[in-house]
Amino acid sequence: MKLVAYPLAVLFAGGLIFAAAMLTAGEASAQQEAVTGAVSGEAIQKVGFRAMIQKQAIMYDLAGYARNVPDGTVSISLQGDKNRIDKALAAIRVGSKKSSRNNVVTAVSAPLDSTLKTFTVYGWTSTSRNITNPYDLVFQLRPASDEISKKEAAAVWNTIAESTLKGDDLDKFKKHLGDED
């Protein structure tokens, strides 16, 4: 009896461990969410607002995009961990030093895109640096999907900008490196 009971107990325990792992994986994917929407406020264009949004995406390892819209709003899409999206949306509502405060974010659920592994600011320019050529700044999601600090996110963002900008625009950017965007 002992010879049969032990292998069955080991098999049962292994099954429990496998089931727990599957539940954990299921919970992780259940926390994944995608939202799309618009941000409105008094001053959210030409003040580094989309760069601030991208830095939030870098901090929280979120995919998506930020794009200026001719009506003065900013179109956004965020995809990733629900709690991290909530933190990013809270920061977007608050704004940055140069942007308006108490911004209105209208975001709705969107379908998850399992192939989306980047966050892009489309058509980035910098009024304060006199960079008028538009650039698409692309952040690649980290393999570990960990959160990083605001300072680390700023360093990553600077690296993205430095690797994307060309010629005089790159020189202008480097001259003002460390300025808030």
Regions found by a protein language model. Name each.
Residues 7-181:
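Intrinsically disordered, low-complexity, mixed-charge
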Residues 1-5:
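Positively charged n-region of N-terminal signal peptides that target proteins for export
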